[in-house]
A protein has these predicted regions:
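Contiguous alpha-helical segments
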Residues: 1-46, 51-105, 109, 114
Length: 122
């Protein structure tokens, strides 16, 4: 059998879509994962679907498809995870800013002391 026919039969059986539907979704996503935006290097894009209803949501790379599955396909948990990551990024940025400000203050104090010596020597 033709590989395209085999894939079409699988997509119809598993997800209720045709290979033309799959290709239209892929084209609408630019051939990349709907989450990370990366083009799949070794494998094709996976059909992501709601396991309870069977509703096809889009096409994902294998890593993203597995990742949302590990979060139980629960958008609330995924949003919490995103907030957690963003908060830690802000903490890292704040620490970097504090470190830079400490260096700026050191340089400022050195310059003030130099200016005092220069003015005092005049």
């Amino acid at each position: 059998k033709d590989p395209r026919e085999i894939k079409d039969a699988f997509l119809r059986w598993r997800y209720g879509i045709t290979i033309d539907d799959f290709e239209a979704m892929s084209d609408s996503q630019g051939g990349v994962c709907a989450i990370c935006g990366e083009a799949p290097s070794e494998r094709h894009l996976d059909v992501d679907h709601d396991h309870a209803s069977g509703f096809v949501r889009g096409l994902l790379c294998n890593d993203c498809n597995r990742s949302i599955g590990m979060f139980g396909d629960d958008p609330v948990v995924i949003v919490r995870a995103a907030r957690y990551l963003l908060a830690s990024a802000h903490i890292q940025e704040a620490n970097q800013i504090r470190s830079i400000m400490a260096e700026v203050l050191q340089v400022h104090h050195m310059l003030v002391e130099r200016m005092k010596r220069i003015i005092g020597d005049s």
